[in-house]
Design a protein with these regions (language model features):
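Pyridoxal 5′-phosphate
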Residues: 1-382
């Protein structure tokens, strides 16, 4: 039985062509570190790393200074570095009712440490209620953290309006782009985003364990480094260096991951985000259209492909969702993710808590035939 992979919201598979080979080549043929030695191979590795930073800035519309592109292990580490580096007891943080635990759990820790936290409400489709969001701002509000697209319903937030509201109140905006980066084009400067947190292993089609954040100088001035250690620069000082990106990159970087991510970014540039987005939206609309009229399921989020990414959650009203997910693999070879998707706030907003949903997430290699097979299986099992 052929497997149909529809769990790209968890991690993309397959990766962009050449990602694995680039990582293998680095490990087996290069293997050096950066900023730690002065021989030619390290200089070449540093140049390759710089190129990936430049590609990230270009992809996200972050300006021309690649030193503001910071590498971390992924979006979770990035969000922790932003939130815990920018906020102090007495400050006020705003998040939304659709956030992943990568935002909600750091927010809970910060609240226990004396930071006031507000959760902005969203409508039944998961879209932020902008008027109610703006009413939450106080003179002590320092940071708003919002996901761009939901990992449960695929809902895309109105980031332009969110950015404008934050700017109007002089509040920094950090964005969780885990389900947005690589799926559609956007410009963080035009959207007035101060820090964009990303992960390499989802829509960017890169490896696990590599991600980061791209920020502007406003965010840099507000941050205290969360992690301290060796950088290979200013080694005589016991303080973290003020220069970027070293200030936020203590320890040995994940160079195989960076090389793999670089290949993935070049693939996205060659194919074009607009082309990938059109294809994903066509498949998403096909999926949603094929399920309309089935009274035994509920699909939270926007009713059509407009306003969402290719993440489709299905709540089976007559069946146990976990059992359905098991049967999808056993009977049909369809791989999905069932449960709360590390996003209990989102499921509470969407009315699918505590049971959760069965999530189908489309990837860049998903075919019409695979979507049709999933539709038939859902109707069979509902």
């Amino acid at each position: 039985m052929k497997q149909i992979y529809l769990d790209n919201g968890a991690t993309s598979f397959p990766k962009a062509p050449g990602v694995g080979q680039a990582m293998k080549d680095y490990i087996e043929k290069v293997g050096v570190n950066v900023n730690r030695s002065s021989y030619r191979a390290t200089a070449e590795a540093a140049l390759s790393t710089l190129t990936v930073r430049e590609d990230l800035c270009r992809l996200f519309g972050a300006g021309e200074d690649p030193s503001y592109a910071i590498f971390t292990s992924g979006v979770t580490m990035s969000l922790n570095m932003i939130m815990k580096g920018a906020l102090h007891p007495g400050d006020h943080l705003i998040i939304s009712g659709m956030e992943h635990n990568a935002v909600a759990r750091p927010a809970t820790q910060l609240e226990a440490a004396g930071v006031a936290v507000s959760i902005a409400p969203c409508d039944e489709d998961g879209v932020l209620r902008l008027e109610e969001f703006e009413k939450l701002f106080t003179p002590k509000t320092r940071l708003a953290v919002m996901q761009y697209a939901s990992n449960v319903s695929g809902t895309i937030q109105p980031m332009g309006e969110i950015g404008a509201i934050c700017r109007r109140h002089g509040v920094l905006l950090a964005v969780d782009s885990a389900q947005a980066a690589g799926h559609f084009a956007f410009d963080m400067q035009k959207l007035q985003i101060n820090a964009l947190c990303f992960t390499g292993h989802k829509g960017l089609l890169g490896p696990s364990g590599i991600g980061g954040f791209v920020m502007n100088e406003e965010m840099n001035k507000a941050l205290t480094p969360l992690i301290a250690g060796g950088t290979g620069s200013m080694s005589a000082s016991l303080e973290m260096p003020p220069t970027l990106p070293d200030r936020y990159e203590a320890g040995t970087p994940n160079l195989p991951g960076i090389m793999g991510l670089g290949v993935a970014l070049r693939y996205l540039q060659e194919v074009g985000l607009d082309a990938l987005h059109r294809r994903e939206m066509a498949l998403t609309e096909r999926f949603l259209s094929g399920l309309r009229g089935n009274e035994h399921i509920r699909i939270p989020g926007p009713a059509d492909s407009k306003g969402r990414v290719g993440v489709i959650s299905v709540d089976f009203l007559r069946q146990d969702n976990a059992e359905v997910a098991f049967q999808l693999e056993e009977q049909y070879g369809i791989l999905t993710r069932c449960g709360l998707h590390c996003a209990p706030l989102a499921h509470k907003t969407l009315g699918t808590y505590p049971e959760g949903t069965v999530r189908f997430s489309i990837g860049y290699t998903t075919t019409e035939e695979e979507v049709d097979a999933a539709i038939r299986a859902i109707h069979d099992l509902a």
